[in-house]
From Swiss-Prot:
Signal peptide stretch: 1-21
Domain of life: Bacteria
Domain named Fibronectin type-III: residues: 22-102
Keyword annotations: Signal
Annotated protein name in UniProt: Uncharacterized protein TP_0483
Transmembrane segments: none
Taxonomic classification: Bacteria, Pseudomonadati, Spirochaetota, Spirochaetia, Spirochaetales
Length: 374
């Protein structure tokens, strides 16, 4: 027995599942007064008839659909009712109840109704501000939503702005939570109190980037064992003393000025000051000789996590007045926006006065740090 039948089920009415209001009607600004209704699949149905009548009961749309949705146009704003009739292969029909349908009055926005097309991600800021022109559609009581273009037809896929207001020039100002957006394109829509979309077809292209110049201060403490090649002629009890292991506890402060930051990649230059006690003996006996290091360096960070830089240190090293430079590889893991764990590998080339000797020092280190933002 067919599921859809006028013979076995006289006056049968299909039990259409309740449609989400957001899926019910879309009013598009691209084609004025165009809307779309959709419904769930009816088992056994091969085609559907869509009837729409106005407030006076006159049929204004009588169309056949082979899919579970139907788009229509040229309807004036107002109240309507629609009915879906399902047909099986024997052309037996069963109809849904008449359902209310409202077409909202909307106004066409100007071309490029949203400016700017690229917005800035401000560190620590609460929201982005999007400016729509004066012709942008918004009426009191509506909800404003920003839809990712790849999820434009998914109910609940939108970002709800914090507020909507007008500036003194008469433009609409829409504040959007800065944590909710990712790089991509979005469509701004107004949703009426009856949950009907009044779509504003201005596309907002979002490229998240931080302020081009900003300052921060890194303060970190950690542990750094030092592996230092010595002169080949030096021996202890006839055994070559090629490596000595030193264990200073380092205090490191870093001040950096970021020249460019986009998509979490950084090119920066800064000033670094270090003070650590330098153990020279194999038995890790401190000799009380402190080394002070000051340096000016360029560095690049990729993704805010991996860093590689070449340092240009200057100052005095008390033990032998050596000159040196080194390359440092750094990986940082930020637990929060400020607290991080840093793993660092440093390769230092030391040149003694008058070039009387050259040595290479490797220093892995592990430290915790805190970043102070401006």
């Amino acid at each position: 027995m067919s599921i859809i039948s006028r013979v076995c089920i006289p006056c049968a009415v299909l039990l259409f599942a309740q449609l989400h209001a957001k899926e019910l009607v879309h009013v598009s600004q691209l084609k004025e007064q165009e809307a779309r209704i959709s419904w769930q699949e009816v088992p056994g149905a091969v085609s559907y008839r869509v009837l729409i009548r106005n407030a006076h009961g006159r049929i204004v749309t009588n169309a056949v659909a082979t899919t579970r949705s139907y788009s229509f146009s040229r309807l004036r704003p107002g109240s309507y009712q629609y009915q879906i009739i399902a047909y099986d292969v024997l052309h037996r029909a069963s109809a849904s109840a008449w359902t209310s349908l409202s077409i909202e009055k909307v106004h066409k926005p100007k071309t490029g109704g949203i400016t700017p097309s690229t917005i800035e991600h401000v560190v620590g800021g609460e929201a982005y501000t999007v400016v729509x022109d004066r012709x942008w559609t918004y009426e009191k009581g509506w909800t404003i939503a920003l839809f990712p273009d790849d999820k434009a037809d998914e109910a609940g896929a939108y970002v709800k702005p914090l507020s909507v207001s007008k500036n003194k020039e008469g433009n609409w100002m829409v504040a959007i939570p800065n944590a909710a957006l990712k790089t991509g394109s979005y469509t701004l829509r107004a949703i009426t109190p009856r949950n009907i979309y009044a779509e504003v077809r201005g596309i907002l292209h979002v490229v998240l980037w931080r302020r081009p110049i900003f300052f921060y201060y890194d303060l970190s403490v950690g542990y750094a064992p030092v592996y230092r090649p010595q002169d080949h002629a030096a021996t202890i009890n006839g055994v070559s003393d090629f490596f000595k292991i030193c264990s200073p506890i380092g205090f490191v402060g870093t001040f950096e000025m970021c020249f460019f930051k986009r998509n979490s990649s950084t090119i920066s230059a800064g000033f670094n000051a270090q003070m650590h006690s330098d153990s020279k003996q194999v038995d890790v006996k401190l000799d009380g000789n402190f080394a002070y290091l000051y340096e000016l360096y360029p560095r690049i960070e990729v993704g805010g996590m991996l860093g590689l830089g070449y340092s240009l240190p200057f100052g005095q090293r008390k033990e032998d007045d050596s000159m040196y430079s080194y390359v440092t590889g750094t990986m940082k893991y930020f637990f929060t926006n400020s607290i991080y764990l840093r793993v660092q590998q440093q390769h230092m080339l030391t040149v003694k006065p008058s070039f009387t000797g050259v040595s290479l020092q490797q220093t892995p280190s592990l430290s915790f740090g805190y970043r102070f933002h401006n």
